[in-house]
């Protein structure tokens, strides 16, 4: 993982923003793929969180040669009603969905987003998926970070949730940095 260097507080151009170029995005996705491969985790498919997770999810899908699906999670400004609630991804996670119905085994799912900032998106998924289908299934205690893993381009270590793979690490409790992803310009 890349530690983001201390920024010069006297240089106002870079105090609050860290721009990431398309080339750096490609390098970061390759780093994530290397981490995933080195860990031995082989995803059956990738879930790209809209909107920020779509670009890295597509790139990782190509590198790892696995299919990609999308999940709309928009939690900014309390807009939880703007989220996809589905059953087949949660059912896959515990072995009853699309992938698991033939073998009755849990699917390996890699959830990809641009940044783990506060942890709200990951927390929402961890709450929504068990609630969507089979909420009392005993396997939910074993799903997270085992066969359902999280990857982000940037991980804020002071977040309330943890990711399994990150290309860059920041700590917003020490220095508040806004990441400028190339698709945001």
Where are these regions (language model features)?
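PRPP-associated nucleotide enzymes
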Residues: 1-185
